[in-house]
């Protein structure tokens, strides 16, 4: 007599531990990591210390997201508007990936996490680009969580870039604006290889999306968490997932 083979879910222990619905884990979670500067100010520390601590939170949340079974985690690391911040702060943020990815890479490889990026990367310093390129190369064959850093990213600029590319293609083919479809725009966005976020989380209590994935979050669930990003932990993420699971997504219907 043959025993029935049951396919085990490697994420089931942590899902069960926190009372999550195993069949309703968001596939794609996007996070606006806000509050690093305020975290540092509360402790009378330089703002850059907040950014450093924020990267430690990235490590923790990436591990939890992977353990839960989230497939895509997109983190808003640096916006196209952030260049207006003080020069020393921008320089520090640009250098963060160099040391951060170097120390984080072994853990990413061990946990089968694949590093990817969206954004206008050509404007980043060469040292930053090299660190990112190495992380992407060393994790390219990983099949687990896709960790997507949005660096020098802006939603309006992304859509504008998409429209310009589509215009050039239409002109070359002798087509008109009547031939433009929603799917065509979607296919020309930086995120074309990923599903739209199911859940968008913003930390620090601010309630705006700050030019982040403005096309892609049309039907995402929004959660505005009061914790500053360096204080955001496993329990907070689990609670956000529970809130997400308590909602009924309608996608414009009833």
Swiss-Prot record:
Keywords on record: Magnesium, Metal-binding, Transferase
Cofactor note: Binds 2 magnesium ions per subunit.
UniProt xrefs under Gene3D superfamilies: Decaprenyl diphosphate synthase-like
Residues given in the record as Mg(2+) binding sites: 34, 221
Enzyme Commission number: 2.5.1.-
Source organism (scientific name): Staphylococcus saprophyticus subsp. saprophyticus (strain ATCC 15305 / DSM 20229 / NCIMB 8711 / NCTC 7292 / S-41)
Role according to the record: Catalyzes the condensation of isopentenyl diphosphate (IPP) with allylic pyrophosphates generating different type of terpenoids.
Protein name per Swiss-Prot or TrEMBL: Isoprenyl transferase
Gene designation: uppS
């Amino acid at each position: 007599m043959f025993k029935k083979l049951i396919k085990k879910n490697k994420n089931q222990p942590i899902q069960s531990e926190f009372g999550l619905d195993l069949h309703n884990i968001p596939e794609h979670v996007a996070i606006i990591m806000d509050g690093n500067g305020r975290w540092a100010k509360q402790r009378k520390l330089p703002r850059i210390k907040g950014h450093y601590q924020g990267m430690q939170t990235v490590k923790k949340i990436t591990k939890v997201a992977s353990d839960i079974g989230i497939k895509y985690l997109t983190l808003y690391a640096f916006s196209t508007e952030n260049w207006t911040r003080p020069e020393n702060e921008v320089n520090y943020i640009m250098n963060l990936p160099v040391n951060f990815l170097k120390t984080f890479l072994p853990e990413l490889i061990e946990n089968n996490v694949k590093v990817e990026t969206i954004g206008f990367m050509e404007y980043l310093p060469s040292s930053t680009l090299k660190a990112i390129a190495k992380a992407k190369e060393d994790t390219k064959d990983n099949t687990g969580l896709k960790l997507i850093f949005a660096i020098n990213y802006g939603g309006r600029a992304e859509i504008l870039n998409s429209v310009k590319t589509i215009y050039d293609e239409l002109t070359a083919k002798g087509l008109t604006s009547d031939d433009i479809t929603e799917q065509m725009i979607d296919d020309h966005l930086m995120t074309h290889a990923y599903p739209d976020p199911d859940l968008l989380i913003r930390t620090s209590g601010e309630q705006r999306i700050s030019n982040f994935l403005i096309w892609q979050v049309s039907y995402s669930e929004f959660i505005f968490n009061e914790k500053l990003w360096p204080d955001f932990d496993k329990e907070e993420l689990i609670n956000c997932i529970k809130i997400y699971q308590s909602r009924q997504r309608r996608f414009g219907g009833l």
